[in-house]
Regions:
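C-terminal soluble interaction/assembly domains
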Residues: 289-290
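Loop/turn positions that initiate beta-strands
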Residues: 233-240
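Low-complexity, polar/charged sequence tracts that form flexible coils or short amphipathic helices
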Residues: 102, 212, 232, 256-258
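Periplasmic peptidoglycan-binding/anchoring modules of Gram-negative envelope and division proteins
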Residues: 284-285
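Zymogen propeptides
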Residues: 1-219
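Short peripheral tails and domain-boundary helices/loops at the edges of structured domains
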Residues: 255-281
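Short, Lys/Arg- and Gly-enriched loop/turn segments at beta-strand edges
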Residues: 244-257
Length: 290
């Protein structure tokens, strides 16, 4: 279009100790929330909300994962709020172009570190659980899917809100199987953090699912070899895990406090990137502020 467009820049002085930037998502994973509503919900006498912008993408009901797999409303890729993992990083929308620079510009994650410094980079997932001297990857977080993969360990935390983990019966009905599973409910010894060793105590074990999760707790679920691995723990045992996220092209592992993913990296040092025209979706205009 040849019409004039106006761009307004909202500037925040993060050297002021009273100013912060926080990621925000609905109180129940899979539910969506307008930014103006989140603004009001998070505003209080000691926590004033002064601006917001919608910057992530979530799975919609017309996509296969949303339509068939109980993932409608769940973010397409990673989220972190105040050091607490919301959802794991995925390969969503990766692979536009073969050149190194093309790939580096696929997805733009906005990350705020513990020094309140902003970064826009691609990030990769590297989470692990250790029981004794054995370890296994944590493949997903808070993706309460009805079609879980075999031979994996997945995690859920209180960002599930009012929703319980899906029951074994629901999963078996969706997949047409009778596959054993196990869930460990664990209590964290410290606050959530990214790229740091976290410890937790196993407080209960079930094989049916349907677990609701309070703040300070997490559920570890396994099927196949994931089930066999989790079965090595018993109530009262101490387990260790690390929610690993690293900058995809340097390997750096910053102290991530906030993280959210837009669709693509559209501008770098004042210049438009190739992602403005190598995917049609990015030519459209979407107002995102609140």
């Amino acid at each position: 279009s040849s019409s004039t467009r106006h761009c307004y820049i909202y500037e925040v002085d993060l050297t002021n100790p009273y100013n912060t930037v926080e990621e925000s998502h609905s109180t129940t994973m899979g539910n969506t929330e307008r930014m103006v509503d989140a603004h009001a919900r998070l505003d209080s006498a000691n926590h004033r909300s002064i601006g917001s912008v919608n910057c992530n993408f979530w799975i919609v009901s017309t996509q296969d994962d949303g339509k068939y797999n109980n993932l409608t409303g769940v973010p397409c890729t990673g989220q972190v709020r105040n050091g607490k993992i919301g959802t794991n990083i995925t390969n969503w929308n990766i692979g536009h172009g073969e050149a190194w620079l093309d790939r580096k510009q696929d997805i733009g994650y906005l990350m705020i570190d513990d020094q309140k410094k902003a970064h826009i980079d691609q990030y990769s997932w590297d989470a692990h659980l250790a029981i004794g001297d054995q370890a296994m990857p944590i493949n997903e977080v808070n993706r309460n899917r009805s079609n879980p993969a075999d031979n994996e360990v997945v995690m859920f935390n209180s960002d599930m809100g009012t929703k319980a983990t899906l029951t074994k019966d629901v999963i078996d009905a969706r997949l047409g199987t009778n596959q054993p599973m196990i869930e460990l409910l664990v209590k964290l010894e410290q606050d959530w953090a990214i790229n740091q060793h976290l410890f937790a105590e196993v407080v209960s074990i079930n094989t049916t699912g349907g677990t609701k999760i309070e703040d300070g707790y997490a559920v570890l679920r396994g099927r196949g070899t994931g089930k066999e691995f989790l079965e090595t723990a018993k109530v009262g045992d101490r387990v260790q895990f690390i929610i690993g996220m690293y900058e995809s092209y340097t390997g750096a592992r910053p102290n991530i406090k906030q993280l959210s993913a837009g669709n693509c990296y559209v501008m770098n040092e004042g210049k438009l990137t190739i992602r403005n025209w190598n995917e049609d979706y990015n030519n459209k205009n979407y107002p995102r502020t609140g």
